[in-house]
Amino acid sequence: MNRLLIILLISFLGSSCESWLDVKPENQVTYTNFFEDEKDVEGAAFEMFATEAAYIGCEGDYLKWQGILADEWSDTYNAPRLGRFSDLAGGWGDGGWKHSYDIVFLANTILENAHRASMSKDRLNFWIGQASFTKGLAYFELARLYGDAVITKNSTSLEKYGRKPMLEVIDTAIVNAERAYRLLPVFEELKDLSGAAITSKQYASKGAAAALLAHLYAWRGSVIELYGLTGDAAGDYQKSIDYCTLIIDKKAGFYELHSSPEALCQAMSKMGGENKESIFELELNPKEDYAQAVRVLGVFLTGYPVNVNATLAAQKSRSFRLKWTTVEQMYEAKDKRVDAYFYLDDEILNNLQTYPYAYLRKWREGIYFTSSSGSSETTMGALRANQVQWRVADIYLLRAECRVKLGIADAKDDLNKVRTRANATLYPAVGENDLKLAIFKERERELLYENHRYADIVRNGKTYIQKYLGYSLATDKGLEENALKYVTDQDLKDGILFQPIPESAFLMNGLMRQTPFWLRYVKY
C-alpha cells in the first residue's frame, strides 16, 4: 500500500510541535492520554518509520564510504576513505548516535504504551512486533557504528547512562528482533488497521525479522573472533545459517530470486512496486530535500545516461568513479550482471581512453530537484528507488559465508545458486581455490553499491580489513595510505573501526566514556 509513503511525506519532521521527538519524557500523562485507539498507535508508528527511513544507513554513516568500491574519489570523501582520523574526529558523521537513539525512543514509546489503546490482541502484537523490529535494527546500527553503546531503560527515564559492552548491545538487538519474529506474520499476511493488505516492505514481517537475525548472528560471531571476545562464534554462525534457511525455504514468507539480473534491476528501480526478491526496504521520500532523498548508495556513481542532464565528461565530477577496466576484472564477459548493472554503447567504447569510466545503471531513474536560486535548471539528487536492506541473493551468500566458516561443504552450492542466475562460471572457476574469498568477491559483484561491502569486509577478519580497507590513494596531498593497511590487534581492540562518540553525548553526563582509539584525536 502507498499509505505509508503518503504519511512519510506528511509527517517526517514536518510538524515538529506535534512530533513524538518533542514530547518531554517526564510528561507521562501525555502518553497515557494519547494512546486511546489503534489509530493513535499507528500515528506514533508512522513517525518511527519516517525517522527509521531517514537515518538508518544514511549519509551520516561514514563507515559506508570506507567500504565503497571505487577507483577515484572526490576530495570531499577522502577523509573516511583514507582514515584521516583528525578530520573524522571533527564531527564527520556525528548524527548517527543521536538519530539511532531517536529511533529507540520512538520504538520504546510504542512498546510501553500501545497496550493502553483499544484493539485486539492480534493488532497489539502487530504493533509491538513493528516497534521491536525497529528497536532491534537501531541497536544493530549502534553496535556496528560505535561498538559499546548506551542501552536505555525506557522512554521516560531521565537518568544518565554509561556505555554497555558491544556484545550486550548486540544481544539487546537480538532480543528485540526475536520478539518481532515471534509476533509478526509473514509479509503476505500483513494487514493494516482497516484490514487491507500491506504492500510496503518497510513494515517489518517474519521474513524481515529473520533477515535481521541472520545478519545479527553473523555479525556477533564475526566480532567475537575479530576482537577475541568470550562467546560462541560457531554457534552464532549456525544460528545465522538457520535464519537464512527459513527465508530460503520460504518458511518465513514468499521470497525468491528474480529470473535474471535485468529483472532484478527493473524491480529495484520501481519504487513501491512488487519486488519478490526484496525482504526489507526503507521507503524513499521523493519529495523531501537532499538529505532525506539520498537512499541508494549507487546515486554517488550514477551519471550518464540515467541522469538526463549528464554527459560522458560529467562522470569525472562524480563523487566516486569506477573504471571500466575494473569492471572487466570483476566480471566475466558472459556475466549477465555486466549488461544489467552498467551502460555500454558505441559512444562510451569510442571514448574509453578519454573517459575510462563505468556508467552505472543498476537503478534506472533519477529524481530531480529545481535550483533554489529560482533557475529552471534541475539537478538529479537521488535515484527513484527504495533502499533494499536485504534481498534473497544476500541471504544465499550470507549463508554461504557462515557455512564456509564452519567448514560446511554446502557453502559452494549457495554461491553457485547466485552465479547460476548471473550466467557466471560455477565455483571453482579456473584459478579459484579459496571458497571464503570467492564468496566475498561474489557479494562484492552481486550486491554492488547496496551498502554491504564494509560489513562484509569486517566480518571476514583482520586480513580482509588490511587488504580491502587499507587503501593507498593519490590525492592533492600526494600519495596517502589508510592506517588500516597496517592495523594491529591492539588498534582493533581500541576501536579503530568505530566512529567516535560525539561531543554532544558527554554534555552533563559524567558516565560517558570515549572509545580508547579516539582519545588520540579528541579531548572528550
Regions found by a protein language model. Name each.
Residues 4-12:
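Sec-dependent N-terminal signal peptides
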Residues 15-16:
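C-terminal motif of bacterial Sec signal peptides marking the signal peptidase cleavage site
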Residues 35-56, 76-146, 158-171, 175-192, ...:
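Conserved, well-structured interaction surfaces
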Residues 38-40, 45, 49, 53-56, ...:
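Elongated scaffold/linker segments in the mid-to-C-terminal portions of large proteins
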Residues 59-70, 185-207, 222-302, 425-440, ...:
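Short, surface-exposed recognition loops and adjoining beta-strand edges that mediate ligand/DNA contacts
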Residues 143-145, 150, 188, 219-228, ...:
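Short coil/turn linking the two alpha-helices of tandem helical-hairpin repeats
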Residues 393-397, 409-425:
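Active/binding-pocket-proximal capping segment
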